[in-house]
Amino acid sequence: MAKEKGRFTIPGESGCEKLTLELADRWGADVVRDSDGTELSKEILDAGMDVYSTICIIRGHNDWAKENKDKLQQTFLATEPKTATEEELSVTLMADFFEEQFAVNDSPLAFSYWQVWDRTEGKLVEKELWKWEKETGKVIIQTTPWHRYSVSFLAYRIWEEISMYNHVTNNWNKEHLMPVEPFYLETQEYLLNWMEQWCKDHSATNVVRFTSLFYNFVWIWGSHEERRNLFTDWASYDFTVSDAALAAFEKEYGYAMTAEDFINQGKLHVTHQPAGKKKRDWMEFIHKFCLNFGGKLIDIVHKYGKKAYVFYDDSWVGLEPYAEDFEKFGFDGIIKCVFSGFEVRLCSGVKTKTHEIRLHPYLFPVGLGGLPTFSEGGNPTLDAKKYWVSVRRALTKVPVERVGLGGYLHLVEGYPDFVDYMEEISDEFRDIYHLHEAGKPWTNSVKVGVLHDWGKLRSWTLSGHFHETWQHDLIHINEALSGLAFEVEFLDFQEAKTTDLSRFQVLINAGMQGSAWSGGDAWKDSKLLECLTKWVYEGGTFLGVGEPSAVSGEDTCFRMAHVLGVDLDRGERICHGKWPGSEEISKRKPGLYLTEKDTGICLDEPEKPLVTKHDFGKGQGIYLSSFTVNPENTRLLSKLLVRNTDYDTMPFVTDKVEAECTYFPASQKTIIMNNSEKELTVKWKNLEGEEETAQLAPYETCIR
């Protein structure tokens, strides 16, 4: 029987025609794509595969950009605070920043947004007390000695960040690509004409792959190699700023955004902190612009009979695939690069026709983490196996229509075991897809809600890949949930107050005090506490992790302490008597103590998170001191979610924590996965309670 092909996208490369076509056959590719810096030859284009063509709409226009340097993208930057030792202080604006990435914008409109701050007093310095010396690149400030000062200014971005990263990583010697700002009408006119001509010139293209739209996630590089990365945040809107957008915002919203609204005392506004009204207004404003102008570009693509897919990374800011109006863009598909299971769920949950995941490792000499991949010291096959283990468990829970690779195909030469393993993965993926095609997988009756400040808008993600957000308990929880047999929904605090919570059996709140994930000042709302307290009393489970519901200025640190049966002492109760067991649990998390006599300490093993339980009415509060995703903790979480149930007798629960099962009733097929590097004999019970057994090699997938 001929091997099934399809649902796989391969990166092609001129000069590597033989390799491209050979691997397309082995991996079952039905689509070929280009990558940044590569082209597809006629031989590849005529090979019978559909063609994805990658465009980054805001770069690759250097001829136009050089003639219109005032139409480049911008951002606010702020100098590091500097201490005045005399009554005058000189601050060199670009001293802290990578001069190949930024240039000062001192146009009259841009200059009107500049600010100087006395950070010692927290006061804005009057404009009469400072001046800009263009010829020296310095701001001269009349100061109070021994106070610290910083300067906030608009800067042009003169090297598009993803191109900059690819350039440095791959040791390119090419012209630096400048990002153009589409907010200007002149840029819009140019880009619409360019898109029209591009479609005419690329008759062989079936799918235009937008990478992505207009604004990259913020990525500020510094002047010192030892601290090159000054700030990066995958979901931040810092790079959407321009003098034109600021002026238009003021006209539409009736108030002006200032430099300090973005700089925020030098802390900037990380996604991990709750968003205030100004930030949410700005996000809404930029999203509306992206939707309007992006829709015009997509209409042109459709006019030429091509499909439009968008990459859910890089210049994705303003796209907001989980916004209610995302479908109005008109995209035919979405593509997400994935390291982890939560990113599969993130991709699959977007309302569009086609979902495609881009597997890792990318075909780059060095991976995103900085370690060698397709170069000396790298082991791309082992990398692929470990990534696939995380991705696979989520793929068995939700459908994704396509899979593929990115990068430079010639790099796989010399790695035949990687080529073999990708052939195995592509076959596995198609098998899993067909099971979803026949019907949904079996799911536990427990529905889980994840409660935080962003709610649905940041479903499954926090702000970037796992290796960028690992410090947060919630990303570990999301990763664990991504492959478990539970329906999961993300909601914000307003929704928790205004919708029927009875659809949930469990609500999870996890994060550091003051973070967006814990909730910050949202917990000062008595209505929120009323709704959640009532819901737990009537039978719900509130599962708090880290510092859930934590806020200062109230009678308890954890506002749900009455439900959880534990609270956190920040020093106010250090002289108060406490229930037995408080001293023991405070060794695991300093300051933690029992608020109720009947709070049970269920698990206090050094290698696992502390777990406490407290009955409240018909429901209960469960507290975990922390959560790190691993097979043991994932099993623990699963058990906690199905309280009052003999977990080990439930269907499709394996006797080995390193293995997992997914059952597809319509096909009457079970997927058994070995998530470890060792051979396993795995047992589980089917729906009839009968025991089944499978012998699995390391990392193996078995479908039967």
Placement of each model-derived feature along the sequence:
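The substrate-binding groove and active-site-proximal loops of carbohydrate-active enzymes
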Residues: 6-12, 28-35, 169-189, 274-291, ...
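Short helix-loop-beta junction
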Residues: 467-490
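Structural motif
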Residues: 33, 209, 335, 505-515, ...
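A short helix->loop->beta-strand "cap" motif at the edges of active sites that frequently abuts
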Residues: 49, 305-306, 353, 538-541, ...
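Polysaccharide-binding and catalytic clefts of secreted carbohydrate-active enzymes
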Residues: 70-329, 346
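Hydrophobic targeting/anchoring helices
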Residues: 44, 61-65, 196, 206-212, ...
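A conserved amphipathic helix/loop scaffold
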Residues: 383-384, 515-704
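Catalytic domains of carbohydrate-active enzymes, especially glycoside hydrolases
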Residues: 4-54, 194-209, 390-400, 480, ...
